[in-house]
């Protein structure tokens, strides 16, 4: 078996990726989220597949087909809520994974980092389209508001929106194509994740100290397979508690009302994981400016390798930038809170200040603090 593991063309790839992979001996639990994201993806594809067997992508029957899944299909309620809350768990793991990458300087592996950001965009697109499928009030109005943002693009905006809608409003054609895209995108994400891993294994993993790890490496199996298993058990526990005790905790009650184009909900808001970007969008009074800020709030992550001014890779030994990092985390939590609030005083000004702080920390303060820390090193 050992020989086959190392000689068989297919097993050899698996062996070099998950068994004999040389891994830094010092990586902490923050490195568990890669495997957890893989599990999230598999879970979402499997639950999604079973939901697709019973779902109908027609405006007349979409809402009742979801009700049918929950009431009449064997364990349909469990599959539906695992899929809905699986998306929330996916984003929790994603945000922690990206945060770890920023904290420990993993963005210096530019190819891996950039493909990771493309993955983030793909997952966000998939989640948005998935939220439209139950065809509740928030599904319909969320789809209307977010797709309408494209009309801010000069010259081609209106045409682009009507092209995406497949008509002059969000209707049957929109729902059908969103279902088609929502079904195919996870497989594209899987392919991108493999490319992400391919580039990661070209350089090897980073480690908490940010120093060259080649001096001390251990095989991935059994050390990290066992370590990852603990993370998986914690993940499954949290997930099951969420699904079985409060499945609607992270959802919107408006989505239990069938979509009605004639009745606008008082507060249109996306799922919780988009609220920070939604708050940045709303903080700019101009439509095109808001859309640009929305896209840049994620695209700005691509600038991290270019904005790295420090001689040290990780934030482990950099107290000033460390402080800025945690201010950034709190700022993102404030933006998430603001995104769920109505557009009125004092939420407008808080959102604007938090948005300015978000871009300022990344573009101005972090590069400057890196240079200051370089000076301190010479003292």
From Swiss-Prot:
Coiled coil: none annotated. The keyword Iron applies. A ubiquinone binds at residue 201. It is found in: Mitochondrion inner membrane. Its cofactor is heme b. Gene3D superfamilies: Cytochrome Bc1 Complex, Chain C. PROSITE patterns: CYTB_CTER, CYTB_NTER. GO terms for cellular component: mitochondrial inner membrane; respiratory chain complex III. Heme b b566 binds at residues 97, 196. Pfam families: Cytochrom_B_C (PF00032), Cytochrome_B (PF00033). It is a multi-pass membrane protein. One of its GO terms (molecular function) is ubiquinol-cytochrome-c reductase activity. InterPro entries: Cyt_b/b6_C (IPR005798), Cyt_b/b6_C_sf (IPR036150), Cyt_b/b6_N (IPR005797), Cytb/b6-like_sf (IPR027387), Cytochrome_b (IPR030689), Cytochrome_b_C_euk/bac (IPR048260), Cytochrome_b_N_euk/bac (IPR048259), Di-haem_cyt_TM (IPR016174). GO terms for biological process: mitochondrial electron transport, ubiquinol to cytochrome c. Binds 2 heme b groups non-covalently. Heme b b562 binds at residues 83, 182. Keywords: Electron transport, Heme, Iron, Membrane, Metal-binding, Mitochondrion, Mitochondrion inner membrane, Respiratory chain, Transmembrane, Transmembrane helix, Transport, Ubiquinone. The chain crosses the membrane at residues 33-53, 77-98, 113-133, 178-198, 226-246, 288-308, 320-340, 347-367. It comes from the Eukaryota. Belongs to the cytochrome b family. Heme 1 (or BL or b562) is low-potential and absorbs at about 562 nm, and heme 2 (or BH or b566) is high-potential and absorbs at about 566 nm. The cytochrome bc1 complex contains 11 subunits: 3 respiratory subunits (MT-CYB, CYC1 and UQCRFS1), 2 core proteins (UQCRC1 and UQCRC2) and 6 low-molecular weight proteins (UQCRH/QCR6, UQCRB/QCR7, UQCRQ/QCR8, UQCR10/QCR9, UQCR11/QCR10 and a cleavage product of UQCRFS1). This cytochrome bc1 complex then forms a dimer. Component of the ubiquinol-cytochrome c reductase complex (complex III or cytochrome b-c1 complex) that is part of the mitochondrial respiratory chain. The b-c1 complex mediates electron transfer from ubiquinol to cytochrome c. Contributes to the generation of a proton gradient across the mitochondrial membrane that is then used for ATP synthesis. This is Cytochrome b. It comes from Petromyscus collinus.
């Amino acid at each position: 078996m050992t020989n086959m593991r190392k000689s068989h063309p297919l097993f050899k790839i698996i062996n070099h990726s998950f068994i004999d992979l040389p891994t830094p001996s010092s990586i902490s639990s923050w490195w568990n989220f890669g495997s957890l994201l893989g599990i999230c993806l598999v879970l979402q594809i499997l639950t999604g597949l079973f939901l697709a067997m019973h779902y109908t992508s027609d405006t007349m029957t979409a809402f009742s087909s979801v009700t049918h899944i929950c009431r009449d299909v064997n364990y349909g309620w469990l599959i539906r809520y695992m899929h809905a809350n699986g998306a929330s768990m996916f984003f929790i793991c994603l945000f922690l994974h990206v945060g770890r990458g920023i904290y420990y300087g993993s963005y210096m592996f530019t190819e891996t980092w950039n493909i990771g950001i493309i993955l983030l965009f793909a997952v966000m697109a998939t989640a948005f389209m998935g939220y439209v499928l139950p065809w509740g009030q928030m599904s319909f109005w969320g789809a209307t508001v977010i797709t309408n943002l494209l009309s801010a693009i000069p010259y081609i905006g209106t045409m682009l929106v009507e092209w995406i809608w497949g008509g002059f409003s969000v209707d049957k054609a929109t729902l059908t194509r969103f279902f088609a895209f929502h079904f195919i995108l996870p497989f594209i994400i899987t392919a991108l994740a493999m490319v992400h891993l391919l580039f990661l294994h070209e350089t090897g993993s980073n480690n908490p100290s940010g120093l060259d790890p080649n001096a001390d490496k251990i095989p991935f199996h059994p050390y990290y397979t066992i370590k990852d298993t603990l993370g998986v058990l914690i993940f499954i526990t949290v997930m099951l508690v969420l699904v079985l005790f409060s499945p609607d905790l992270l959802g919107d009650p408006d989505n239990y009302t069938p979509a009605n184009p004639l009745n606008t909900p008082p507060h249109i808001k996306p799922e919780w994981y988009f609220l920070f970007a939604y708050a940045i969008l709303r903080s700019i009074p101009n439509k095109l400016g808001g859309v640009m800020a929305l896209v840049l709030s994620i695209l700005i992550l691509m600038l991290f390798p270019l904005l790295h001014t420090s001689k040290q890779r990780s934030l482990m030994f950099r107290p000033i930038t460390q402080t800025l990092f945690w201010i950034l985390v709190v700022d993102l939590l404030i933006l998430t809170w603001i995104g769920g609030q109505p557009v009125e005083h004092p939420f407008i000004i808080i959102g604007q200040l938090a948005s300015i702080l978000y871009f300022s920390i990344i573009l101005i303060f972090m590069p400057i603090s890196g240079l200051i820390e370089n000076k301190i090193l010479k003292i």
